From Swiss-Prot:
Role noted for this protein: This protein may encode an integrase, which is necessary for integration of the viral DNA into host genome.
UniProt similarity note: Belongs to the 'phage' integrase family.
Provenance organism: Pseudomonas phage Pf1
MF terms (GO), sorted A to Z: DNA binding; endonuclease activity; metal ion binding
Keyword Hydrolase: yes
Superkingdom classification of source: Viruses
GO terms, biological process: DNA integration; DNA recombination; establishment of integrated proviral latency; symbiont entry into host cell; viral genome integration into host DNA
Span of domain Core-binding (CB): 48-133
Gene3D superfamilies: Intergrase catalytic core
Keyword Nucleotide-binding: no
Name of this protein: Putative integrase
Catalytic residues of the enzyme: 193, 216, 269, 272, 295, 304
Record key words, sorted: DNA integration, DNA recombination, DNA-binding, Endonuclease, Hydrolase, Metal-binding, Nuclease, Viral genome integration, Virus entry into host cell
CDD domains per UniProt: INT_Rci_Hp1_C
Length: 333
């Protein structure tokens, strides 16, 4: 135990892991016993959690990013979200944060945002603890591991009709940014996310296909396109081996607003929904759609299954009502 008196107060001064470890100095204790108790509590908490006594939730988030988050494609974005979340939670001491603290935060948060947003926050923070546990940097259980997420109604996906698609493309063609039109065409032809189509390089378009790389889930995919679209891409796209298109998201937003479509919360992503919806309504296969969209799980793609003409069609032919009518018709023949 290393404590010393500095004037009228006491200071705890010790090393975390011997002389080679981090030096801990905490000043301002009124009594010697309080300084000694701090050192005892420090090592007790470290033994229980694997983290220093004074580590706060934001410190865990930083450790998570350094050890794992930096390897994720959206790592910096998730870091920013988790840091903001820790701040809204009051940045508690890590060893004091528990499921009850989260439940109280959730109650307050629901007055500001939708339940799905709170569920997203819970998944992000729970993933931080789970990964630190796997890495051996957190010894306690995940405080959110047993917390159930809020049940929400499935959101009906909005998509554009064929007439609306034609109207939107006319507005894109009239845009002052001449890359807006081909990028919109790519999204509608291949189901691409806007940023995937917008960031295409010249080498990614060849052989009648668009080859998407470095995408959201790191799974590359190739989707065929019409010859006319391939020629247009090379004609309008920027020269050289780099990007074909300049940034045109803002130009698309203006074109979309000129159309006056009422699709709250939808902008560029509605092109992806529109492709998938019309693909299924045209009799497309759900597994093929999964590969086209690049979904890692079929669960995400199943949102479009109900649009298939054959979806649950057997409910009519196999229903007892249908069978009774069918039987009655046989009797009267």
């Amino acid at each position: 135990m290393t404590v010393r008196k500095d004037g009228k107060t006491w200071t705890a001064d010790f090393y975390e892991n011997g002389r080679s470890g981090r030096r801990i100095r905490k000043k301002g204790f009124a009594t010697k016993s309080a300084a000694i108790r701090y050192e005892q509590d420090f090592f007790a908490v470290k033994g229980e959690t694997g983290r220093p006594l004074d580590d706060r939730l934001s410190d865990l988030v930083k450790v998570w990013y350094d050890l794992h988050g930096c390897t994720l494609k959206d790592g910096k974005q998730r870091l920013a979200r988790c840091e903001a979340l820790a701040k809204r939670l009051g940045n508690p001491l890590a060893f004091e944060f528990d499921s009850l603290a989260w439940a109280r935060y959730r109650q307050r948060r629901l007055t500001e945002v939708k339940p799905e947003t709170v569920n997203h926050e819970q998944r992000y923070l729970s993933a931080v603890f789970s990964e630190l546990i796997r890495l051996g940097s957190w010894h306690k259980e995940n405080p959110l591991g047993k917390v159930r997420q809020i049940k929400t109604d499935q959101v009906e996906l909005t998509f554009l009709s064929l007439d609306q698609v034609a109207r939107l493309l006319e507005e894109c063609k009239a845009s002052t940014n001449n890359h807006t039109y081909p990028v919109a065409l790519l999204c509608l032809a291949t189901g691409a996310r806007w940023e995937e189509a917008e960031s295409l390089t010249r080498g990614a378009v060849h052989g009648g296909k668009v080859h998407y790389h470095r995408i959201k889930n790191r799974q590359s995919r190739s989707v065929p396109i019409p010859d006319e679209l391939e020629r247009l891409i090379f004609k309008v796209g920027m020269p050289g081996s780099g990007r074909l298109f300049m940034s045109c998201r803002a130009a698309f937003r203006c074109a979309y607003q000129r159309c006056g479509f009422q699709t709250p919360g939808q902008m560029t992503h509605i092109l992806r929904h529109t492709f998938a919806s019309h693909y299924m309504m045209g009799g497309g296969d759900i597994l093929t759609l999964q590969r086209i969209l690049g979904h890692s799980s079929i669960t995400m793609t199943m949102r479009y299954a109900h649009l298939s003409p054959e979806h649950l069609a057997s409910a009519m032919s196999l229903s007892p009502l249908y069978q009774i009518k069918h039987f009655a018709s046989q009797v009267h023949q």
